Amino acid sequence: IQYAAIKAYSEDHSEYLENSRLILKMIGDYIYKELSSVGVICQKPQGGFYMICDFSNVVNKTHEINNDKTLCQKILNDIGFAMLPGSDFGMEEDKLLSRIAFVDFDGSKALKMISKEKPSSDNFLDLTCPKIAKGISLLKDWIISK
């Protein structure tokens, strides 16, 4: 194991890390732009693979949706889009906050594509992240219908 660690730490991983960051930035920017366009207040991600979104401006509290947990459950039941309630991460439950992770894509395919050329984000997302694009589209349609 120690020899494996020496090998792993001796290689230059800078291109892999740069490309991984670029992929996640492109996905995060896309989700931010799309959800912001329908009034969801999102914290633009600075790195990582998730963002916090506030649905208070676009979803009215009702008997069916009265906190972040019921919001997430309703969206999951209605359109099959999974996100976690903000209260799972220490935020107030009565706020309509959620954490959306953007990890449902083929990372190997995305890395290969980004290494060959720096594609436009829309083309890249269509080719490597179709489930994310479809999920965000369904979520936007759900919000608009409310």
State what each model feature region is.
Residues I1-K146:
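PLP-dependent class I/II
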